[in-house]
């Protein structure tokens, strides 16, 4: 078994799901367990300045082996998994030499992953894939990134003959709930530039991401006995449905791709008396992003005129912005990644992230930080999988980037 696979299978055994609407960082105590294990592993590998912060951030240094003036590079991945589906008791399975057909994830439950539903699955024919048993997500997002960074670190620490500058490693909590760098110590991290290893398909390089906002839409209804409700009842749940119908139908995650933004209704809580709808708003274009937020407010105003003031109230909070403007002055980061992939006969593909990464916010905190692939697909659900062959290649990509910066 390859080292990166062995590490990955170990890391996904840790239940590290983060939670929304929790004040502390980390949002769940279970993230500490993996953090402590990673801290101990880094120490055992011989990394220096290994430390864990009071907010569950793990940092480490691989000292430079060259006297040349070389930028200090950082590599960052996150420890938590998305709350979209449970990651407790993950039972990974390695499908050897995938034949290109359907993969039965759980025969008893009739859960099958098919290239008819997931066409990109076919691209992995002949590779070894790590899949779920259909009852949990896998955790490749971002434990594949952690395994790749850790395996890269082990290689550099056991091959001191390789010339490289100072390498900084950072593992973060709570990325999936938008708080991954709330307490990240950029100055103490000590990197001039960094990469997150939190992408998807092998060969992808990302330095554009969504502008993102979260919305908490509160609706105050009027509860009356339904037998005597004529002209009196305001059903908050139905009002929420009316609000949703006033948003553009085509600007929905299921109908968008590439640079197209969307409104996404993530969760509904409510009764006749009151309801709360939780939305996320996304767009790569800053102007369109602002327009989407304005439309949200306009719909609230319109419905308040119809149903009475203070029936609808929206709390809109920006989460992160498109890092493109912060990375473009340092395009050597993208160019080096391309060069590294080409040297390894991997075709680089620059694509926009239809999401966000810790790197997006780090870029606005003074640490330009594009995103690199991990080899995983179908994140945040039971059909998630990771290519073992791709993980091994990503380790090589990281090492090659480091070597290129030392030349």
From Swiss-Prot:
Gene3D superfamilies: 3.30.70.360, Zn peptidases. CDD domains: M20_peptT. InterPro entries: ArgE/DapE_CS, Bact_exopeptidase_dim_dom, Peptidase_M20, Peptidase_M20_dimer, Peptidase_M20B. Binds 2 Zn(2+) ions per subunit. One of its GO terms (cellular component) is cytosol. It catalyses: Release of the N-terminal residue from a tripeptide. Keywords: Aminopeptidase, Cytoplasm, Hydrolase, Metal-binding, Metalloprotease, Protease, Zinc. GO terms for molecular function: metallopeptidase activity; tripeptide aminopeptidase activity; zinc ion binding. Its EC number is 3.4.11.4. Its cofactor is Zn(2+). It is an enzyme of class 3 (hydrolase). One of its GO terms (biological process) is peptide catabolic process. PROSITE patterns: ARGE_DAPE_CPG2_1. Zn(2+) 2 binds at residues 141, 176, 380. Signal peptide: none annotated. Cleaves the N-terminal amino acid of tripeptides. This is Peptidase T. It comes from Lachnoclostridium phytofermentans (strain ATCC 700394 / DSM 18823 / ISDg) (Clostridium phytofermentans).
